[in-house]
Every structure is written in structure tokens, then in C-alpha cells.
């Protein structure tokens, strides 16, 4: 199957199957060792995804299978952008294996397009690099028990903190009342902040 056929099938399928991480309850994300694409694994046939899921479980990677119906696909594909995923690995380890870059399948609203309407260019509150690094970190951390955290996970943790500081934050403010605080019975006060 060529790439165009796979794209058409992804757009028109009644359902697709996705490998989900039990560690994050989100799509299982893999970094390709050659292209460095951050990929999710998608299959058209239930028996194929079950075979791949079984292989991953045998490798001690806790995963489950999720079915995405046609009416959920656009939402699913769009959410991959906010997760930092840039590629779909379709039917991995099969004759029909195909790598699809996410923008080839769905485009984002005009955030980065110069000719986009002004209402689409507004600031978006999202931090895909934080989300992606956190997914990799949790997938690896919860996969096995460590007596001490490996150096690779410590580096990911540092990257998460660096990405967190680059985030955009929104605080509520009421004219005349100032910044709202959530006061607890024990005297603690918290300021609500919304972030990516």
C-alpha cells in the first residue's frame, strides 16, 4: 500500500486501533531511533494491534488497545499536536507498514500560517515539548521499579523542569476584587493558575 492509500484509509476508516500506555492512559509514544520522529502506533485491523500489544507486554511494556471510531478521529489526530507527536507509524512490522507525518494527515488551525485569520493566530496555551517529555518519563518510570533513578530519567526530569519554565500561564483577575485565592480550612491559600 502506498502512502496516499494509507492517508485515504486513515481519513475514511470506520475505526482504527491505537496502542495506549497503561502508565499514562494516553497513546503509547515511541521515538524512532533513525528519524527521531515521535510516533504513535496505529493499526487498521484488530488482530494486528493485538499481536503488537502482546509483543510489547512480553517486553514488559504495559500497554492496552484502544479503538478510535470515525467520529473521534479528527479529535484524536488533533490532540497528537498538543502531545508533541509528529508522526503516525501505521501497521508497524507488517508488509503495509507506513510512516505518516502528522501534518500530511491533518493541519492545525492557522497558528503559524501568515495568511490565517486573526482569531486563529491568538496565543495558544500548550507546551508540546513538556507534554512529550513527561510522557516518555512516565512510560519509563512506571514500567519498572528502580532503587535509584537512572541517569537517563534524571536527564528527562531536568528537561521537564526546563520545559515547565517555558510554559505560558494564565491567572484569573477580578476587577475591584484582585486575584482570587482558594483558602483551605488549615489556613493555606492557593492562587488558581491555568497552564499548558
Where does each model-flagged region fall?
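An interfacial alpha-helical scaffold signature
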Residues: 1-195
Amino acid at each position: 500500500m502506498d502512502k496516499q492509500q494509507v492517508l485515504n484509509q486513515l481519513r475514511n476508516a470506520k475505526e482504527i486501533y491505537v496502542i495506549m500506555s497503561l502508565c499514562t492512559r494516553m497513546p503509547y509514544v515511541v521515538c524512532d531511533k533513525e528519524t527521531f520522529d515521535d510516533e504513535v502506533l496505529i493499526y487498521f485491523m484488530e488482530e494486528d494491534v493485538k499481536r503488537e500489544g502482546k509483543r510489547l507486554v512480553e517486553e514488559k511494556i504495559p500497554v492496552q488497545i484502544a479503538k478510535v471510531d470515525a467520529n473521534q478521529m479528527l479529535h484524536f489526530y488533533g490532540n497528537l499536536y498538543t502531545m508533541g507527536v509528529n508522526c503516525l507509524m501505521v501497521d508497524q512490522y507488517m508488509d503495509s507498514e507506513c510512516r505518516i507525518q502528522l501534518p500530511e494527515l491533518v493541519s492545525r488551525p492557522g497558528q503559524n500560517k501568515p495568511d490565517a485569520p486573526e482569531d486563529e493566530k491568538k496565543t495558544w496555551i500548550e507546551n508540546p515539548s513538556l507534554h512529550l517529555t513527561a510522557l516518555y518519563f512516565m512510560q519509563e518510570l512506571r514500567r519498572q521499579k528502580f532503587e535509584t533513578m537512572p541517569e537517563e530519567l534524571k536527564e528527562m526530569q531536568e528537561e521537564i523542569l526546563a520545559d515547565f519554565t517555558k510554559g505560558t500561564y494564565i491567572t484569573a483577575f477580578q476587577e475591584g476584587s484582585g486575584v482570587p485565592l482558594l483558602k483551605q480550612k488549615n489556613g493555606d491559600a492557593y492562587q488558581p493558575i491555568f497552564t499548558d
